């Protein structure tokens, strides 16, 4: 991998790590907040399921669009949408709004993952695909590991409203 592609990989690695860590922070906080808003267990399931459902349907769509239009036009807008939608959690005051926010968060996530993975495939030299994708996925799962620990710590040591 040449120097520019290493920089691109590093940027994508840390960007995904940060984004997924943020999602992971929400995991232990969201059910508590939803319960405080009056959500039953079923509605907590809807809140979490909305993210995965929208992501499932939009992953192939954004993957295909990036095949047609290139990878770069989706990455920055995808991260921007992801960040802005994340801020919406702070202003959510109903169970229904949490479901809607999670639905759109899933769409923003779908705008990122297949595009970034394809971009990494594009810049990876032949014969290095496995190690490169393994390293990239380690950023994803490290974020999924650390995020809930951070969120749980926030929940235990700071009021939920402060989190």
Predicted features by range, described:
Residues 101-140:
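Cytoplasmic helix-loop-helix junction between adjacent transmembrane helices
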Residues 85, 96-104:
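Paired small-residue
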Residues 5-28:
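Pair of pore-lining "gating" transmembrane helices in MFS-fold secondary transporters
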Residues 29-38:
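Membrane-interface helix caps of multi-pass secondary transporters
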Residues 136-163:
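Helix-loop-helix hairpin linking two adjacent transmembrane segments in secondary transporters
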Residues 57-93:
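Conserved MFS/SLC helix-loop-helix module at the cytosolic interface between two early adjacent transmembrane helices
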Residues 40-48, 133:
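Juxtamembrane helix-start elements in MFS-like secondary transporters
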Residues 52-60, 144-145:
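Residue-level signature of mid-helix packing/kink "hotspots" within the transmembrane helices
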């Amino acid at each position: 991998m040449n120097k520019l592609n290493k920089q691109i990989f590093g940027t994508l690695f840390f960007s995904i790590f940060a984004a997924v860590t943020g999602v992971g922070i929400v995991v232990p906080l969201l059910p508590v907040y939803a319960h405080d808003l009056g959500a039953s267990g079923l509605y907590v399931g809807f809140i979490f399921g909305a993210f995965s459902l929208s992501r499932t349907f939009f992953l192939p769509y954004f993957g295909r669009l990036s095949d047609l239009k290139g990878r770069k036009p989706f990455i920055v807008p995808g991260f921007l949408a992801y960040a802005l939608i994340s801020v919406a959690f702070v202003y959510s005051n109903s169970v229904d709004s949490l479901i809607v926010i999670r639905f759109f968060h899933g769409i923003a996530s779908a705008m990122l993952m297949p595009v970034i993975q394809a971009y990494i495939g594009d810049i990876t030299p032949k014969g290095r695909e496995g190690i490169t994708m393994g390293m990239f996925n380690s950023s994803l799962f490290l974020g999924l590991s650390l995020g809930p620990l951070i969120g749980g710590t926030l929940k235990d040591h700071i009021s939920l409203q402060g989190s």
